[in-house]
Amino acid sequence: MPVLIATVGVVAVAALVIAIFVVIKFGRAPRVDAGNVRQPSGMSGPDAAAAEAEIREARSELERREQRLAEREARLDAEHERLAARERQLAELEEKLGRLQAELAQVAEERRLLLERTAGLTAEAAKAELVALIENQAKRDAALTVREIERAATEEAERRAREIVTTAIQRVASEQTAESVVSVVHLPGDEMKGRIIGREGRNIRAFESITGVNLIIDDTPEAVLLSCFDPVRREIARVALERLVDDGRIHPLRIEEVYEASRLEVERLCQRAAEDALLAVGITGMHPELVALLGRLRYRTSYGQNVLKHLVETAHLAGVMAAELHIDPQLVKRGALLHDIGKALSHEVEGSHALIGAELARRYGEHEDVVHAIEAHHNEVEPRTIEAVLTQAADAISGGRPGARRESLESYVQRLERLEEIASAYEGVEKVFAMQAGRELRVMVLPDVVDDIQAQVIARDIAKQIETELTYPGQIRVTVVRETRASEFAH
């Protein structure tokens, strides 16, 4: 029963709220006396008061909502008006922009027509002429810049190259001895020559047959000569003959025994020389066959220069230059040390020693850059790597410096003498000095005989005669010095 009463009360309150909303929305309801209002059936006094309070609260909430809606509607109306004004303003600006663009196009066209009438050129022709002018100017500026860069690069390259080569030469100092292609064996007396020849020449024939070396016995006192194109065979024969002379027993069987022992001794010396060379250069891990061939070069000479010493010197020079250029020196030194390895077999295999050496290095597992440095050091193959170029440079420095080879030293001295002879033959020349290893010729002339103009003529004539008569690397600078001195004494 209480639940039913509560439900009826809620329904009554809801109906009352709806009625109040309708009255507020559509008009005021006629005033009703409090006495005319009947309480819902079954609703007590307290319940009616509570319902009345709820109705008042609902009415207040509705009024607040209506006020907020009205304020929002007012704001929306104001925003709409503002947007409409902005749209009208944008339309006016667009219209003004269109007029300005049209005026600008008209002015540009009038300017173009005026320029064409003034210059006598169409717009396309003027544009092409301007582009050509700018292009030519840019090319000229670029050419000047390139020329300046090339000049600076050339000067820097020459300076750096001279510095590198000079540093390498200064840091490498090696002794060179000019060796002959003929070995001399000294004898305790001339009677030993007869024992070497033997009865009916059997000893000398056996010696030459076993060793492959020509034994020359002439009128030279207490000495015999050994001649052979193979320096290793000649060295073996020299050691064998010295042992035979010391022993005193000389006959074909003894010659054969001593030759075999001498051959083993020379092979040990070659092996030791090769190992010393590798140790001096700082190279390891080389194939034993290459080491053996390298040792054979201990007894080979080229223009009087020992080949093994030349290889060690070349390796040091190449290593120093590689270090200056921040390149791995080990690879460069390896190629430089082996660049003449083909000379150990050049008479046994057809081909040049550079190509033979390259094939040997390739066969025994050397790096391809090392192989290329060997085959390209005489330009039989075009150098493609910096290692090959450094090997060429080091080889030229080692073999080309004065004193390294007899033939180059003789030609060097002859060239200097000829330079001085050419300059001394001119009238009025007092002194001549060949300086800087023959790269500069300084000529002192008599000031009373030669004037300034004649000095220039003499310098030009000497230079032309040198070009005609001499062959020389690089260039030779001819400087004619004419000096006049006047002196007085104050008493």
UniProtKB/Swiss-Prot annotation:
Alphabetical list of InterPro entries matching this protein: HD/PDEase_dom (IPR003607), HD_domain (IPR006674), HDIG_dom (IPR006675), KH_dom (IPR004087), KH_dom_type_1 (IPR004088), KH_dom_type_1_sf (IPR036612), Ribonuclease_Y (IPR017705), RNase_Y_N (IPR022711)
UniProt-annotated location(s): Cell membrane
Membrane topology: Single-pass membrane protein
Xref: Gene3D superfamilies: Hypothetical protein af1432 (1.10.3210.10)
Keywords assigned by UniProt, alphabetized: Cell membrane, Endonuclease, Hydrolase, Membrane, Nuclease, RNA-binding, Transmembrane, Transmembrane helix
Domain KH: from-to ranges: 181-247
Protein name: Ribonuclease Y
Organism field: Acidothermus cellulolyticus (strain ATCC 43068 / DSM 8971 / 11B)
